């Protein structure tokens, strides 16, 4: 197994045309993860379609439909190595209706690179991306100000974008001084692996240098096992193979596991990562595994796998702390939007507005408010309309954070602070 280096999941986030996929393609290419002849082939193909600059982006957008439309749709997992780490890139789509993909992508990330184009600067979506990165608990951020070639490598422009993004970070309670900013051109390759002579005014490290400064998150191996399922495949000769990322605990061959809320159990026969069989999987590993006694219809996206003697909680109702990002009118009791939590998407009804909080300090402003509007923070109670695995965010951050979506937009984001468990036995 070639995993001696520590592993980091990296989300690359950005507005639709800000060069996110090109940045990822360039990283992969410079790290030697993409053979030069493939890039050449993509280049020719891209030029013949009049999209010459998309060559690196095509490394990521390897889905036919995406190529035609020039947008990243599903989350692509790619691997590349730096001197110090090996990275799995979660390329998060930037289109508006893909924010929910981004939520499930970003919630798997240990660190994020937010790509902002120098000529355009901060866009509406950039705000949402910064906010979601915060809500989804991504502590380490690098802001790559891309397309510097299109801004004449101008230092003043870089500083302007830096201060605009800095203002956004402050809004969500992140100190901009803890975030690394770097001017790049993914297309030209400036400041990716070597410092660009076109921007002598930038004295910092290259993008690869900054990636090597990231810290590997502590692996919560001592916690109970939790694996949110992204998909379940039927593979001939093997059977059903659920796929997901281990969030906490250790998954071992021979273990008895239970999938919730499906309430189906079986024994782990084999575990695979990056197409190689492994004896056990630890937090951060994106894996496929085969379970004896589990059929194709027993497991679906949104289920969570745990040890049979300590299965994931299924929420009868839950209390959450949320921040309302946007809503055309007011949110009242009875509102039933879709909650995107780990890989699940489930409609939940607001059953009680417990209190309104000051978003900056967390102090209570009002008990039992009659409604909530954009900008409010609150404690609420909710009831899932169908079984949903949800855990207290203090114990299992990855299974307790969520985004709330309705009408094609992210309405709110938050975390679960208490779960009333459903009896499943």
From Swiss-Prot:
It is found in: Cytoplasm. GTP binds at residues 14-21, 91-95, 146-149. GO terms for cellular component: cytoplasm. Keywords: Cytoplasm, Elongation factor, GTP-binding, Hydrolase, Magnesium, Metal-binding, Nucleotide-binding, Protein biosynthesis. Residues 146-149 are annotated as: G4. Residues 91-94 are annotated as: G3. Residues 70-74 are annotated as: G2. Residues 185-187 are annotated as: G5. Its EC number is 3.6.5.3. One of its GO terms (molecular function) is GTPase activity. PROSITE patterns: G_TR_1, G_TR_2. Mg(2+) binds at residue 21. Its main location: cytoplasm. Residues 5-221 form the tr-type G domain. It catalyses: GTP + H2O = GDP + phosphate + H(+). It holds the Pfam family GTP-eEF1A_C. Residues 14-21 are annotated as: G1. CDD domains: EF1_alpha, EF1_alpha_II, EF1_alpha_III. It is an enzyme of class 3 (hydrolase). GTP hydrolase that promotes the GTP-dependent binding of aminoacyl-tRNA to the A-site of ribosomes during protein biosynthesis. Belongs to the TRAFAC class translation factor GTPase superfamily. Classic translation factor GTPase family. EF-Tu/EF-1A subfamily. This is Elongation factor 1-alpha. It comes from Methanospirillum hungatei JF-1 (strain ATCC 27890 / DSM 864 / NBRC 100397 / JF-1).
């Amino acid at each position: 197994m070639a995993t001696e280096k520590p592993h980091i999941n990296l989300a690359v986030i950005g507005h639709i045309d800000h060069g996110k996929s090109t940045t990822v393609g360039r990283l992969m290419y410079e790290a030697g993860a993409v053979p030069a002849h493939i890039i050449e082939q993509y280049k020719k193909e891209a030029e013949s379609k009049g999209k010459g600059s998309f060559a690196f982006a095509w490394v990521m957008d390897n889905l036919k439909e995406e190529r035609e439309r020039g947008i990243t749709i599903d989350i692509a997992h790619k691997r590349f190595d730096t001197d110090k780490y090996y990275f799995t890139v979660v390329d998060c789509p930037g289109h508006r209706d893909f924010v929910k993909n981004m939520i499930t992508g970003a919630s798997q990330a240990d660190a994020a690179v937010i790509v902002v184009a120098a000529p355009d600067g901060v866009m509406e979506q950039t705000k949402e991306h910064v906010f979601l990165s915060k809500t989804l608990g991504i502590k380490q951020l690098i802001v790559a100000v891309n397309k510097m070639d299109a801004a004449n490598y101008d230092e003043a422009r870089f500083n302007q974008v830096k201060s605009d993004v800095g203002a956004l970070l402050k809004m969500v309670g992140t100190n901009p001084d803890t975030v690394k900013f770097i001017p790049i051109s993914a297309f030209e390759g400036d400041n990716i692996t070597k410092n660009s002579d076109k921007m002598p005014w930038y004295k910092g490290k290259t993008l690869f240098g900054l990636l090597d400064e990231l810290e590997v998150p502590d692996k919560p191996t001592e916690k109970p096992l939790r694996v949110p399922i992204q998909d379940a495949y039927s593979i001939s000769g093997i059977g059903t193979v659920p796929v997901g990322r281990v969030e906490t605990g250790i998954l071992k061959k021979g273990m008895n596991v239970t999938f919730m809320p499906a309430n189906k159990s079986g024994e782990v026969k084999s575990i695979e990562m990056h197409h190689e069989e492994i004896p056990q999987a630890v937090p951060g590993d994106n894996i496929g595994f085969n379970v004896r006694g589990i059929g194709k219809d027993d497991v679906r996206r949104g289920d969570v796998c745990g040890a049979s003697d300590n299965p994931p909680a299924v929420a009868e109702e839950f209390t959450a702390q949320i921040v309302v990002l946007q809503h055309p009118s007011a949110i009242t009791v009875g509102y039933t939007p879709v909650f995107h939590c780990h890989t699940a998407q489930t409609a939940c009804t607001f059953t009680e507005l417990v209190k309104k909080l000051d978003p900056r300090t967390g102090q209570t402003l009002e008990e039992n408010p009659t409604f909530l509007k954009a900008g409010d923070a609150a404690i609420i109670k909710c009831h899932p309309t169908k079984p949903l695995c949800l855990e207290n965010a203090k114990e299992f951050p990855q299974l307790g954070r969520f985004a709330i979506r309705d009408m094609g937009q992210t309405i709110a984001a938050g975390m679960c602070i208490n779960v009333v468990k459903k009896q499943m036995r």
